[in-house]
């Protein structure tokens, strides 16, 4: 374990001890405020100086405002002086992370947070949204509970990061890929099946479906068009939830590492996890083609037991619509 990792491991232990002490505070608002401040102080130590932490209201250019946020990270360098003089209101474009901190996560607190982050998204907010809780009221899967409360869980969830101390750290990732990466033109031509209204064009030349395999035309990556669509530009997204579950400081270290890696030019977050080697699982998967069609939506609270090599797809196209659909290969 590196010195940096050891020091932050000790800071996290201290944070948890302070949380236990704060339990004796009777006033819920003060108790929650203490926990928020101590957690935000820890976060402030792993972000570059150009970023600042504040508590207040996020506003967009239309004057629409968010609910009061526990705290957020914003880019101080892009703000003009007249805005810096009143940081009670921060432009949505400047936000880089938005946090909600809970002492005990329950169903009500979860739904309230989802609602807050939904309003932030409506303002045009695109920064990662984080729900961190020091404890929880359930023994079961935190991610599964969240899945059941957010209709957009698989694709565009209101929470991008869910972290419960001594239990689990989960984050949502999306990758954009091109069909040509997994199916070169040569393979497409070999396996394509004729469909009604399927029009092909190679460069400026229209070609019949039946003559496609016999043509002597040179077909490169950007010359083939299917019903007016450039084959090389057909793309799709892979939505996945990753996470690590552990009853220890590895949960907070993973969260801090992720924040640091996102905001720093270099991946300094790896220092926080040095010697830890957390085992991350994929808990959900979902594919979305460039026309918004969703397929192969799956979730397992224990982690999915297959990988991308176990996925197959079909592509169909006509004058009205196009679909690139994925599914798990049958055994």
Can you annotate each of these PLM segments?
Residues 1-68, 73-331:
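Intrinsically disordered, low-complexity Ser/Thr/Pro/Gly-rich regulatory segments
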């Amino acid at each position: 374990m590196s010195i940096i990792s050891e020091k932050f491991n000790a800071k996290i232990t201290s944070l948890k001890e302070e949380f236990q002490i704060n339990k004796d505070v009777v006033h819920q608002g003060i108790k929650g405020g203490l926990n928020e401040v101590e957690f935000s102080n820890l976060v402030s130590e792993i972000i570059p100086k150009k970023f600042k932490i504040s508590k207040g209201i996020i506003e967009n250019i239309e004057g629409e405002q968010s609910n009061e946020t526990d705290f957020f990270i914003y880019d101080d360098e892009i703000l003009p002086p007249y805005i810096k003089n009143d940081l009670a209101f921060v432009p949505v474009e400047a936000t880089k992370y938005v946090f909600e901190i809970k002492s005990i996560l329950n169903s009500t607190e979860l739904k309230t947070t989802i609602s807050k982050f939904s309003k932030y998204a409506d303002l045009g907010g695109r920064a990662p949204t984080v729900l961190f809780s020091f404890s929880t009221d359930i023994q079961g899967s935190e991610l599964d509970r969240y899945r059941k409360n957010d209709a957009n869980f698989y694709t565009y969830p209101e929470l991008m990061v869910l972290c419960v101390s001594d239990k689990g750290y989960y984050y949502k990732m999306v990758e954009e890929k091109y069909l040509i990466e997994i199916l070169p033109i040569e393979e497409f031509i070999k396996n394509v099946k004729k469909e009604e209204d399927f029009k092909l064009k190679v460069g400026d030349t229209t070609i019949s479906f039946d003559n496609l395999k016999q043509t002597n035309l040179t077909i490169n990556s950007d010359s083939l068009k299917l019903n007016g669509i450039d084959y090389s530009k057909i793309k799709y997204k892979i939505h996945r939830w990753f996470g690590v579950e552990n009853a220890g400081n590895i949960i907070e270290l993973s969260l801090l590492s992720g924040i640091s890696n996102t905001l720093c030019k270099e991946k300094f977050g790896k220092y926080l996890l040095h010697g830890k080697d957390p085992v991350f699982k994929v808990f959900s998967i979902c594919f979305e083609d460039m026309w918004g069609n969703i397929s192969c939506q799956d979730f397992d609270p224990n982690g999915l037991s297959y990988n991308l090599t176990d996925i197959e797809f079909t592509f169909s196209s006509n004058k009205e619509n196009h679909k690139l659909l994925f599914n798990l290969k049958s055994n």
